[in-house]
Amino acid sequence: MAKKKFVENTNWKKIDTDNQLIFEQGGFLGLEEIDPNDYFLTDKNVDKIEKQQKQKQKQEQEQEQKPTNKLTTKSTTKSTPVQNKNQKPVDKKRKSKKGNDDSDNEYSGYQDDSDQDDEYSAAKKKPRIIKPTETVDMGTELLNSFVEGTVHNKKKQRKGIKVKQIIDDNDNDFEDEEEEVKPQQKLQKQKQQEQKQKQPQKQPQQPNKKNNKKELQKEEEEQMEEEKEEEEVQQEEEEEKEIKKPIKEKKVKTQKQIEAAKKNINKLEKIKKRKEISEQKTISKEEQDQLDMSEWNSYNLDPLILKGLRSLGFSKPTEIQSSVIPVAVSSGYDVIGAAQTGSGKTLAFGIPMVQRILQHLRKHGQNVENKANKQQNDNDDENEDVEEEEEEEEEEGRSKEYRKLFSLVICPTRELAIQVTNHIKSIISHTNLKVISIVGGMASQRQQRVLSKRPEIVVATPGRLWELITEGHQHLVELESLLCLGIDEADRMVEQGHFAELESILKTLPIHRTAMSKKERLKKKETEEKRNKRRKVDKLNDKGEMIKGDQDDMDDQIPDEEMEELEQEEQNHLTTTHKRQTFVFSATLVNIPGDGAPTSQKKKYRKLTPIENLIEKVRFQRDYKLIDVTQKRLTAKNLLETKIFCNLEEKDMYLYYFVERYPGRTLVFVNSIDCARRLIPIFNILEVPVFALHAQMQQKQRLKNLDRFRTLDNVVLIATDVAARGLDIPLVQHVIHYQVPRTTQLYIHRSGRTARSDQDGISVVLVTPKERPLYIKLDSSIEHDIGNFPTDIRYMEGVRDRIELAKEIDKLSHQSLKDNREKSWFKKQAEEMDIELDGDFFGENSDDEQSEDTRIAEQKKQFKLKQLRAQLKHLLSRSLLPRGVSQSYITASAIQELESKSQSSAATDFSNKAKNVIGKKAKQLAIENHSKFLTKNKKK
């Protein structure tokens, strides 16, 4: 018996113990199983060791008092030698005692029982009798005793380790416990395998013979006990695995559920943000109580509509609303309206529609109030993939007969349809009416499911609407109860070659029974034209001679076949008892100079304009009123219109100058998708936050880019004319016409994206010499001057360097991408055709000079690309300063200039320049007047 020697080490804590190490058959007792954490830090470990020492002393005292005669007699009765075994039989008393210690101390099965078990095993150990003539191999004997001792201690201490693991097993360090248990289990399996392999070596060859049957029986019993013990250990290990498996699975499941829940929460937050942006924001109840709604009371609107307007904070109607609502609500006329962009046209036809639906439902005793006063969630949210669950129960007091399609609104673009839906939804928040949008680019199955909820108002684009009508959806086919029809941006809908489905949709709409048929109108028109032609109208020419009217009327007669087609069309048409109310609106509907006017005064009969053709196709069932609130100035009053004359190569420079010089929400319009695709990578290389919006993009991506443009502060959106009409994007400070718009209507609609709702805005037109004739036409049709935008030439040198580098980088990267695409295409085609391509094709595995040249050229290209990117990165890291100003040597004048530039905006710079120009002109006039006055005095 030897005491433990202590070695001084600064990294380990000295612990004084009376622990004894037994180098007999027990092997190196306890060294492998000591927890290294017990040697680190602290007072807790010292307290544990003191408790262990006290427990050892008590156990030693108890063992001394117990009689040990039975153990000695058992060990001495055997006369014959016994073979060495790997493990000793387990005593039942020892097991029960061990179980009690496990409950008292967390390290009980690990250190405390070790000394006790060693004493017990030493007492139970059978003495080995060696004859003088017998030879013994000490190496094998020592090896066998060492293995027996280590294995024996391992088995004894397993339960202590398990107790420790169960106590330390909690939610916070569950994963650490798994990592500790796994290597221990592997070691146990390895040692068991080694044990089985070494078992035949443990029996030294001896010439002893077993003649006694009792001894054989005892040996068999010992073997049986050992086998049972091994089985118990295996069962315990299996139980541990079974216990831990479900815990692991549950943990994994909960982690997955947590991740899914986090994703859903993020999606819901995005939905809320987008809804707040897209929908009209409501005000607080205190602000609602302070609002004066007296101007709305004169229109006799439903109180639920007034509640919705109050919650939005609309205390008074706009000009177009005050002109349309009395005519549509009180008098019941159809309306053809024209107003500037951002003037409230959507609610101008939305309020009369909702008013008529509510009147119809109240007249038939139906419930229209939303008792919960919650906003509708039935709209298929086009901005997200997450579907909102809807209640399938019908509203209280509403029968199925009165849950039909009462109002239909047709819009040219998907984004405009979604915007109109949100505007109408905001005023019906206190009713139980439903409004949805049906647009392309979304799953038709989902939209069919939303239509099955039978919404009263549908806002749609012509393509998807006609698709669902032809499929025979019940809610869109049953149009007998249609009360209102709205067409927004009508001039866009009647453009040649666009929206062919609109005419088919208008033909499917029901006709009022008492209304005049198309056949009758044509007959009446024909008779009037014949009467006018037969009448001799006298006219005077320039010379004063009399001219008679034309009497030829054969060309204007309608053939019989056309009359038969009209009769069949009238028979196939749906009829209704309701007189449908129609609203046709646009910003450039009427009063555009040159549109629809005759080319010469000599022509007696002018050709019908597209709008007049639309009016014929719509089949107004009431008398209509034409309401035009557009002013002589077709754009908004608070819009500053400017221009920049430049060369084609300088357009990118001026665009980057404007974006870098005046940060904010900038909307750039181009005439083609190719132009947008060319600009996007250049501005991405220049690290400008830029997004695209054009017709060839997927609807989901278009909506995402629009939402990003709405949420970010300093951002650029490069768009085609898809974004020119109807979109209400808040706080757009700048609109840049990168290419001159082809028509005046496009210019007005593009410029109308800024300076909305009494906010300031500026539009800039970039004009090249080639586009100058188109700009002259635009300038003459607008009938007011467009000023020159002030540009600081000192900044242009730095802008030019950045643009040239970005263009060169884009060119090289685009060429490499193009080559890679071609190679990948050839590879794909070769794989499909089971053809092997030569290595020369790709410049690989070839000694040809051309292939080496191509490799060298490619390496040079890549090196040059890296160089250019490094140069551009260096330029972008520095602020854009005017020529003559240095970052190293800052002067007082430079500081003042930088402060004024940082605080200025495009509008202020333009207004300051205009003031300076006016001041110069005033000075010149004053000097001229003064000189004239002096000359007069001299003459006198």
Swiss-Prot record:
Sites where the protein binds ATP: 339-346
Residue span, Helicase ATP-binding domain: 326-607
Coiled coil region boundaries: 42-66
Record EC number: 3.6.4.13
Helicase C-terminal domain residues: 650-797
One Pfam family, short name: DEAD
Short sequence motif named Q motif, residue ranges: 294-322
Protein name: ATP-dependent RNA helicase ddx24
Gene from which the chain derives: ddx24
